[in-house]
Structure formats: structure tokens, C-alpha cells
From Swiss-Prot:
Key word Kinase present: no
Protein name (record): Small ribosomal subunit protein uS3
GO cellular component: cytosolic small ribosomal subunit
GO MF, one annotated term: structural constituent of ribosome
Function: Binds the lower part of the 30S subunit head. Binds mRNA in the 70S ribosome, positioning it for translation.
Gene: rpsC
Gene3D superfamilies xref list: 3.30.300.20, Ribosomal protein S3, C-terminal domain
């Protein structure tokens, strides 16, 4: 059933944790679920497709019930912060008005946007809405993900591709994407692209590696550093090819 389930939800409590973390009574849970939904909706609607990959909400301390800690993970922190923090202050003020509580707003930069499933799907949706060919969009997303250090990626686009009257699905994948392995760190996202021919569905699976005992997801998602050594070619002088500088390794 690994092929049919959401990989993020399937791994909760195993290698992943929840985006909302509370320390409350059972009677308060329904109201807080609705409040968290409205908080995320407000942040995402404030400026659509501003490269937000994750929104974490924490209410962990009993003494600070009237304070909510919100952490926004984004590839473009400058857009969220704004000039002199103007945009950040607006978001914080609207959240305070919505929840009637003190808001501690943190903004963290995503170091690897090319291998973060939500950001990859957002970029693909934007390109499809700009009428770029879907196969080119798929290939570009896969190439960038592998260049960023991903070990496997699968991309699925469904709908009226290229304006065809009959909807269909096109899948392209590279590398390993072990959906049945619960210790496999698989990032998943599903979004929609609104084109002139209708709505296209986009799904992205990215495999970062296996989380071994004693490790966390942060260990498998470290920024990729290339280990390749580049060798300079010989540089020749005008006197002839016999007079040259030996190649040196960096």
C-alpha cells in the first residue's frame, strides 16, 4: 500500500514529526485544529507562491498558553520579511488579530529548494501556467534535484496535457524512490496548476536517503557538497606546444 498512501503521513512517528505540536487537553484539540488551519491559510494567502515549504506551529508550554510560536520555512526569506521587516510585521499583526494571542514568528531559509518537494512542485506549476511544455518542465525538475544531491525523484503530471481533449497522466522518474521502506526519507507534495485548458495535477516524490538508527531527517537532508576534483588543462605559450605548464589539481 506504499504506492497509494501519502508518504509524509505514513512516516509520522517513525522518522517524521508533526507540523503542529501542542501540550493541551483533549477538549481543546478540535478548536486548535481549526485555528492551525486558519493560520496556515492566512500565511499562504498573504502572498501566493512565495516559496513557503513548511509552517510549524508550537504550543508546548503550559505557562505560555497565550503565546504561539510559528516557524516559516521559505526559500525566499526576503519576500516574507520585506523592507525593514514591514511584511513580517503585517503577517504577525494579522495572526495576532486572528488568534487573539501573542505571536512569536520565526523565518528560516531553505538551503536546498531544488530538492524540496513542495518548492519543486510550486516551480513546476508556475512554469506550466506560463505555457512551458510539460516534458521539459519534468526534465528540468529532475536535473536540478539530482544536481542538488537527491538520490531519486518521481514526477507525475495529470490533466489536459498540451491542451488535449482527453486527460491523461505522464510520469517521469530517475533513481530510487522506495515507497514501501518506512525508514526511507521521502519528501512528497501535491499541487495544482491552473492553465487556460484547465487544472493540471502535479505530484512530486523525492528520495533523500535512509534514516538509520541514531539519525534524523536533518542528517539525510544536509546541503549537497560536490566532491569532484577539477583538473586544469595545460596552458600553452606562443613559443609552441612543448613549452607548457603542467596540470595541477585544485
Amino acid at each position: 500500500m506504499g504506492q497509494k498512501t501519502n508518504p509524509n503521513g505514513l512516516r509520522l512517528g517513525i522518522i517524521r514529526t508533526w507540523d503542529s505540536q501542542w501540550c493541551v487537553n483533549d477538549k481543546e484539540i478540535p478548536a486548535l485544529i481549526k485555528e492551525d488551519f486558519l493560520i496556515r491559510q492566512l500565511i499562504n494567502n498573504f502572498s501566493k507562491r512565495n516559496s513557503i515549504s513548511q509552517i510549524e506551529i508550537q504550543r508546548l508550554k503550559e505557562k505560555t498558553k497565550n503565546r504561539i510560536t510559528i516557524t516559516i520555512h521559505t526559500a525566499k526569506p526576503g519576500i516574507i520579511i520585506g523592507k525593514d521587516g514591514e511584511t513580517r510585521n503585517k503577517i504577525q499583526a494579522q495572526l495576532k488579530k486572528l488568534t487573539q494571542k501573542d505571536i512569536n514568528l520565526n523565518i528560516l531559509e531553505v538551503k536546498n529548494p531544488d530538492k524540496t518537494a513542495v518548492l519543486v512542485a510550486q516551480n513546476m506549476a508556475e512554469q506550466l501556467e506560463n505555457r512551458m511544455k510539460f516534458r521539459r518542465v519534468q526534465k528540468m525538475a529532475i536535473q536540478k534535484a539530482f544536481k542538488a544531491g537527491a538520490k531519486g525523484i518521481k514526477v507525475l503530471i495529470s490533466g489536459r496535457l498540451n491542451g488535449d481533449e482527453i486527460a491523461r497522466s505522464e510520469r517521469h522518474d530517475e533513481g530510487r524512490v522506495p515507497l514501501h521502506t518506512l525508514r526511507a526519507d521521502i519528501d512528497y507534495a501535491a499541487l495544482e496548476a491552473h492553465t487556460t485548458y484547465g487544472v493540471l495535477g502535479i505530484k512530486v516524490w523525492i528520495f533523500h536517503g535512509e534514516v538509520l538508527p541514531g539519525q534524523t531527517i536533518l542528517d539525510t537532508r544536509k546541503p549537497f557538497v560536490s566532491q569532484n576534483k577539477f583538473i586544469k588543462r595545460p596552458r600553452y605559450f606562443k613559443g609552441g606546444k612543448n613549452n607548457h605548464v603542467d596540470a595541477k589539481e585544485n
